[in-house]
């Protein structure tokens, strides 16, 4: 994997091998916009599948994302989706305890969004995992990641797809979480 930092635009270009529709690995260059990230919390098995199905009333809800992000992305227009797939993602299963707390065993996925499609009242979010991160670290450093764990049913306990106005690379660096992007 070759990674370049774009000092003028705040984006990161990643060259990696991705499977195409037939499963064959082909080179792909992805430009990541690190100014925001997807936080996807689900009850689905995130380790055996490469997509999440989210009902629309839990997708980019006005009360769970910034007003600017809601205005830009909630429509799921082709232009919005083209911009959203440039954000990295944290995909995780609902935490095991109240307030977003979990044990050391529960893992989240740091990855890339490959495709977003809306079908009736569902949104399919296809992703490519890059590495695992301990979900307990997200809980312990929730403020750094823009995650609210102040109530019993927190952001990590509630199935939802949100976009956080947090630079995921900086948050991971600040909290000592190793991901597959070099230090800047």
What are these regions (language model features)?
Residues 2-5, 10, 122-184:
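Contiguous surface segments at macromolecular interaction interfaces
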């Amino acid at each position: 994997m070759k990674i370049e930092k774009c000092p003028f635009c705040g984006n990161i270009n990643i060259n990696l091998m991705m499977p195409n529709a037939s499963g064959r690995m082909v080179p792909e260059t992805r430009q990541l916009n690190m100014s925001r990230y997807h936080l996807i919390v689900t009850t689905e098995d995130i380790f055996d599948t490469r997509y999440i199905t989210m009902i629309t009333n839990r997708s980019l809800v006005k009360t769970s994302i910034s007003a600017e992000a809601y205005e830009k992305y909630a429509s799921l227009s082709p232009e919005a989706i083209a911009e959203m797939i440039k954000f990295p993602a944290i995909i995780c299963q609902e935490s095991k305890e109240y307030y977003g707390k979990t044990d050391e065993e529960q893992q989240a996925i740091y990855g890339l969004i490959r495709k977003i499609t809306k079908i009736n009242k569902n949104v399919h979010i296809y992703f490519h995992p890059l590495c695992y991160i301990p979900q307990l670290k997200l809980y312990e450093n929730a403020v750094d990641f823009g995650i609210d764990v102040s109530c019993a049913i927190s952001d990590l306990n509630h199935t939802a797809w949100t976009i956080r106005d947090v630079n995921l690379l900086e948050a991971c660096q600040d909290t000592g979480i190793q991901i597959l992007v070099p230090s800047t």
